Design a protein with these regions (language model features):
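Short hydrophobic/charged patches on amphipathic alpha-helices used for structural packing
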Residues: 69, 123-126, 149, 186, ...
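N-terminal helix-turn-helix DNA-binding module of bacterial transcription factors
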Residues: 1-78
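Short catalytic-loop micro-motif centered on adjacent basic/acidic residues
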Residues: 111-113, 138-139, 199, 303
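Amphipathic helical "hinge" segments at domain boundaries
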Residues: 63-128, 132-136, 213-217
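Short beta->alpha connector loops
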Residues: 116-119, 140-145, 264-265
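Short beta-strand segments enriched in small/hydrophobic residues
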Residues: 28, 33-38, 72-88, 188, ...
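Acidic, Gly/Pro-rich loop/turn segments at junctions of secondary structure
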Residues: 136-149, 161-170
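Bacterial carbohydrate/catabolite-sensing allosteric modules
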Residues: 1-15, 60, 101-106, 154-161, ...
C-alpha cells in the first residue's frame, strides 16, 4: 500500500465529512458564540486580542461562514436554477452565461441542468431544484404541460420561461420572434429570384420549429408561391436525417434552388451537403454560428441574440424576486437578417 506523505504546506489537514462550526471556533478560541459571530460578520464590540484569537482559530480549523444559513434567515437561499435543452449546444452557452452574470450581480448562485429535450427529465430537474429551495427558475421548456409547477409558483418560486412558451401555465416568457425572422429570411430568398425554396428544421412539436415553419409558409404565400410538401422536412437534427433530406431536395428533376434551415445545427449539416454539389444552392439559416462568415460562400443568417434572451429573462426573474406583482409578461425580441453571400446567390437555372 502506498504511503501518503504530509503536504508540508503548513495549512490545516483536510477534514472530510463534518465541517467545522462556529461552536468549534468558539471552543478553540475560548470565547462565546456571539463573539465568533461578531468577528465573522465584521461587527464591532470585540477587542483586538480577542479578534486575533478568533481569527487564529478560524484559520487553524479551516472554518467557512455558512452563507446558506445566513440567506435562509432572510427568506432566500441565494440560488436560482436554469434548465436548458442542452448545455453543450452553442446557442445556449451565451444564454447561460448571461443568466449567470445577472445572478452574480444580484448575489445569487446559478445551478444549471440539461433536459435533453425530454419532458420527464425537465420535470425531474425542475422539481429537484425546487426541493433545494432555489429562489427562482429560468426554464427552456421541453414539455407541453407545466401544470406540475403550479404549487411551486403558489409557494413563491419565481419562474420565467425562455425561448419557448410554457404549456397550460400562466408565467413570464421571453422569446425570439421566430415567425417574423423566418418570414424575413424566406422573403430575402424570394427577393433574389427564388421560387422553389425548401425548409429543413427541427421537430414540429417544438414551438420554435413550428413558428419558423409558419413564417416560411407565410413568406411563400406573400409571394403567391406554391409549397410542395416534399420541400418541407422537419424532424430530429441528427446529421444523417438532415443530410438525407437536403440531398433529396437539391437533386432530382425539379430540385429546389434555395434552402431555409431552422437552426444552427441543421445549417452546419446542410453546408456540408451543399459543398459537395456541382451547382450552387442559395441558403439562409436561422441562428448565427461560429465561422459562418468565413465559409465559401459566407452563410447568410437570421440572427437572434441568445445573450439578450438570457439577460432579459434573468432581469425579469429578479424583478419578481424583488416584489414586482404585475400579471405575467410576454417579451418578444426581434431578429436581424445578416446578408453574407449564400442567401444572395441567384437561382442556378435562371428561373
Amino acid at each position: 500500500m502506498a504511503e501518503i506523505a504530509p503536504s508540508g504546506t503548513g495549512l490545516p489537514a483536510p477534514r472530510y465529512g463534518g465541517r467545522p462550526t462556529m461552536k468549534d471556533v468558539a471552543a478553540r478560541a475560548e470565547v462565546g458564540l456571539k463573539t465568533v459571530s461578531r468577528v465573522v460578520n465584521g461587527e464591532p464590540g470585540v477587542s483586538p486580542d480577542t479578534e486575533r484569537r478568533v481569527r487564529d482559530a478560524i484559520t487553524a480549523l479551516g472554518f467557512r461562514r455558512n452563507d446558506s444559513a445566513r440567506v435562509l434567515r432572510k427568506g432566500r437561499t441565494g440560488s436560482v436554477g436554469l434548465v436548458l435543452e442542452d448545455l453543450a449546444d452553442p446557442f445556449y452557452a451565451p444564454l447561460s452565461r448571461a443568466v449567470e452574470e445577472v445572478a452574480r450581480i444580484h448575489g445569487a448562485l446559478l445551478i444549471n441542468g440539461s433536459s435533453a429535450e425530454d419532458p420527464a427529465r425537465e420535470r425531474e430537474l425542475v422539481l429537484a431544484l425546487c426541493a433545494r429551495r432555489v429562489d427562482g427558475l429560468v426554464i427552456v421548456p421541453a414539455g407541453e404541460d407545466h401544470r406540475y409547477l403550479e404549487p411551486e409558483l403558489a409557494a413563491g418560486v419565481a419562474t420565467v420561461f425562455v425561448d419557448r412558451p410554457p404549456g397550460s401555465l400562466a408565467a413570464d416568457l421571453v422569446l425570439t420572434d421566430s415567425f417574423g425572422g423566418a418570414r424575413s429570411g424566406v422573403a430575402h430568398l424570394v427577393a433574389h429570384g427564388h421560387r422553389r425554396i425548401g425548409i429543413i428544421g427541427d421537430h414540429p412539436g417544438i414551438h420554435t420549429a413550428a413558428e419558423r415553419l409558419r413564417g416560411y409558409r407565410a413568406a411563400m404565400a406573400d409571394a403567391e408561391l406554391p409549397v410542395r410538401e416534399s420541400w418541407v422536412a422537419l424532424g430530429d437534427t441528427a446529421p444523417e436525417r438532415v443530410a438525407a433530406d437536403a440531398t433529396r431536395m437539391v437533386t432530382g428533376e425539379r430540385p429546389v434552388t434555395a434552402l431555409f434551415t431552422g437552426n444552427n445545427r441543421v445549417t452546419v449539416t446542410v453546408v456540408r451537403v451543399l459543398a459537395q454539389l456541382a451547382r450552387p444552392v442559395a441558403l439562409v439559416g436561422f441562428d448565427d454560428f461560429e465561422l459562418a462568415d468565413l465559409l465559401s460562400p459566407p452563410v447568410t443568417v437570421v440572427a437572434q441574440d441568445p445573450g439578450r434572451l438570457g439577460r432579459d429573462a434573468a432581469a425579469l426573474l429578479f424583478r419578481r424576486l424583488d416584489g414586482a406583482g404585475e400579471p405575467p409578461r410576454r417579451v418578444t425580441l426581434p431578429t436581424r437578417l445578416v446578408p453574407r453571400g449564400s442567401g444572395e446567390l441567384p437561382p442556378y437555372d435562371g428561373e
